[in-house]
Amino acid sequence: MTFQKQPPFVWRKPPKGDRISYVKYAIFALIFFLTCYYSAYSIAQLHNYRIIIPEHGGQYLPFHPAWTLVYISIYIAQALTLLAVRSKEECLAWSQSLCYSVGMATVIFVLFPTEQPPVEHLKELSGQWMDLYWVTATTSTKANAFPSLHVASMLCTVWYSTQEKPRWFSLLMYAWFLAVAYSTVVLREHYLVDVLGGIVVAWLAIMFSQKKLRGKSVDNSCTLKKPQP
């Protein structure tokens, strides 16, 4: 597999013959995430060992429930990735990067379960965004704060969505990533150190997925160049 020079595009429909593969890759990544995420949570409930991060040294920011909209916008970004990647192989690499992120994070969740920032005192607050905040918060589990899987998966998504894209588009996508990362802290889902951990996990996941993508490209190139009898 080699990437042929294509006219610049931001989003486009996948090639007709590859659309099912795109959807399968996305569904597999989702199922892998749900399986690992809730399995790690179940294991954490078997013991009381927890790592507590001290709330000082700039580890948290003031609470702003309106940022819930930005927090959940990651799902829009992931859906749009199916329109942004350049090929079926690149879509597979994106899916693999998500799975690598989840796999690495799950090991850490099991071995070093880290508690999220406390939110009990937020129950006293009211406002137009609080209902949405609590609905979103109920989907999260405990003892999996470090690293931030939300940050890791968003960075993988943005990276694969911006390959050979216009500069303005890449800047907007990375600004979107920063906004999502910021939202995890102001919504008291994570500490700043969790965000940094998520970035490291994403970097490793992208590196591993790219290595497999390049290896597949070399193999296919050799097959194409093989002389016919």
Regions found by a protein language model. Give the residues of each.
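Membrane-interfacial alpha-helical segments at the cytosolic side of multi-pass membrane proteins
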Residues: 76-83, 151-173, 199-209
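Hydrophobic faces of alpha-helical transmembrane segments in multi-pass integral membrane proteins
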Residues: 28, 32, 36, 96, ...
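Membrane-interface loops
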Residues: 41-57, 86-169, 216-217, 221-225
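N-terminal transmembrane-helix/juxtamembrane module of multi-pass inner/ER membrane proteins
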Residues: 2-77, 124, 133
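C-terminal membrane module of polytopic membrane proteins
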Residues: 187, 197-229
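Interfacial helix-loop-helix junctions of multi-pass membrane proteins
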Residues: 123, 141-146, 179-206
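Aromatic-anchored segments of alpha-helical transmembrane domains
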Residues: 34-39, 102-111, 175-186
